[in-house]
Amino acid sequence: MPNLSEAITEGAARLEHSEVAEARRTAGVLLCHVLGIERTQLLTRSDESISEAHCELFLRLVDRRAAGEPLQYITGHQEFYGLDFIVTPDVLIPRPETEFLVERVLNLIEESKEASPLVVDMGTGSGCIAVSVAVHARKTRVLATDVSRSSLDIAMKNAAKHCVRDRIEFLAGDLLAALAGRDLEFAIDILASNPPYVNAASAQELQTEVRDWEPHAALLGGPEGLDFYRRLFGDAAAYLKPDGFMVIEIGYDQFAAIEELSAAHSWEIVDVTLDLQDIPRTLTLRIMSENTATLRLSR
């Protein structure tokens, strides 16, 4: 029977043959998943033998990754904003850039004069935004919506996992339609969303593991990638408080189009958060007033 070090070497070789990036690290993650151990234990236990059953399972998982299945779907987990989230093919895998959106929402909550501000996460998916906000801002009330009931099931599991299930209300429905009949007109302090924004041309250029495995409903935003933004800009004003904010994530090349589209619907961009490549990634907007705020850049 091979030891842990030999198993990783074999797994990494298979992954390298399929041109999987970070092959040895990926093999280590999969072996830890199979054995139920931490990454640090791979070093301290490298000479320890692995059972035949564990070795067979490990290599099956390696072959799944070599075939293009995302690592997060194989292990069922993804870290986001310092928390561990359950993920399945029913939900988009949380991305690091979405952490900028969470950070911005938390800053707005901190600045709010409301004793218990209401935050709505539109299209919650795995629940990574809603759960992260609820965990880190205990005074908030959180609503999370999604058109997919399978996604809501995963989001509710993540809320329970992080002990905030009783503080998040989950609603099924297509964007703002989920709020109908809830007496929420002009009641929301912060509306947050990471909507589908991949356009038709870019969809053909997505990585295979994204295009072939992640839910298209959570990725594709119409011919220009703007369909969901149009709906948000058209309908959200009826639900936000007069001094409320909408916080959205956008694609790497969408700022100019979103700036034009939002202005056409009487929204003003009051803050632009740049990602680590200095690309506009998270926008904070509010309904236009006579005294337009000065645009602020933040990192």
Where are these regions (language model features)?
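Conserved Class I SAM-dependent methyltransferase catalytic core
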Residues: P223-R286
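Conserved AdoMet
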Residues: P2, V29-L108
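Non-catalytic nucleic-acid substrate-recognition regions in nucleic-acid-modifying enzymes
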Residues: M1-T26
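Conserved SAM/SAH cofactor-binding pocket of Class I
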Residues: E97-E205
